[in-house]
Amino acid sequence: MCERSLYRAGYVGSLLNLQSPDSFYFSNLRANGSQLAALPPISYPRSALPWATTPASCTPAQPATASAFGGFSQPYLTGSGPIGLQSPGAKDGPEDQVKFYTPDAPTASEERSRTRPPFAPESSLVHSALKGTKYDYAGVGRTAPGSATLLQGAPCASSFKEDTKGPLNLNMAVQVAGVASCLRSSLPDGLPWGAAPGRARKKRKPYTKQQIAELENEFLVNEFINRQKRKELSNRLNLSDQQVKIWFQNRRMKKKRVVQREQALALY
C-alpha cells in the first residue's frame, strides 16, 4: 500500500517553492511560467532530496508525450481549437490527454451547433413522387409526367384543358374521332421509347376493266399458269408479277365457292 506522507514531493515542493525537473533547463522560470525572484536556482538534482524519492508503485503512469511538455499543456491561444497528440489506441482521459492549439481548427461547440441536412436516398424520393400520382383519381388537373407531355404537345390540348376545368358531365357525348386523332398525333411525339411506325403500306390500285377482261380470258383457257405466262401477262397489262399471281389465286377460290354453293342448292 502507498501511504500519503508529508515528505512526498507534492507536499514539500509546494511549501518550499521547489522547481520541476524542466526548470533546470530554464533556471528563472517556475512550472507555471512565472519568474522566481527571491530564491536562487538550485544546483543539485531533485533526486538527491530524501523526501523527493517516491516508490515506483505510488508513481502514476504517464504517457511518453506528457513528459515532452513537462506534464502541463501549452497556453491557450485566442480563436484556436485543440488537437490531441495521443495515439488512437491510448485511453481517453482528461489527465492523460495532451493538446496543443492551432488558430485554424474550429472548436467542438461550433461543430456540434452546425446542423447537417438529412440524407434521403434516391429510391425514397422516387417512391414519394410516385405515391402522390399513383391513386390520384380525384385531381383531374394533376397528371403524371408522361401524360403532361402528351397534353402540352397535342394540338387539341388547350381545348381539352378548358373542358376539364369545369364540372364533368357524364351524360355528355364525346367525339371519339376527334379524341382519337389527337391521341394518335401526340403518341409518337410524347413517347420516344415507343416502336417506330412501320413501312407505309401501298395504296391498293383496283384493276381496270381491260385488265380484268384479259385476265378472265386467260383464266378460262387455263386456271393455273406457269411463271413464263405470268410474266408475259404482267408486261402486257402493266401489272406486277405478284398482282397477276394473287388475282389468279382469288379467282380460283371464287370459282370453288360458286361450285360449293351450287352443290348445296342441288341437295335441297
From Swiss-Prot:
SMART domains with a match to the protein in the record: HOX (SM00389)
Keywords attached to this entry: Developmental protein, DNA-binding, Homeobox, Nucleus, Transcription, Transcription regulation
Localization per Swiss-Prot or TrEMBL: Nucleus
Annotated GO MF terms: DNA-binding transcription factor activity, RNA polymerase II-specific; sequence-specific double-stranded DNA binding
Family matches, as Gene3D superfamilies: Homeodomain-like
A cellular component term, taken from the record's GO annotations: transcription regulator complex
DNA-binding region of this protein: 200-259
Residue span of region Disordered: 102-124
Main subcellular localisation: nucleus
InterPro entries: HD, HD_metazoa, Homeobox_CS, Homeodomain-like_sf
Key word Transcription present: yes
GO BP term (any one): skeletal system development
Role, per record: Sequence-specific transcription factor which is part of a developmental regulatory system that provides cells with specific positional identities on the anterior-posterior axis.
PANTHER family tied to this protein: HOMEOBOX PROTEIN HOX-D12, HOMEOBOX PROTEIN HOX-D12-RELATED
Family of the protein in this entry: Belongs to the Abd-B homeobox family.
Protein name: Homeobox protein Hox-D12
Gene name, Swiss-Prot/TrEMBL: Hoxd12
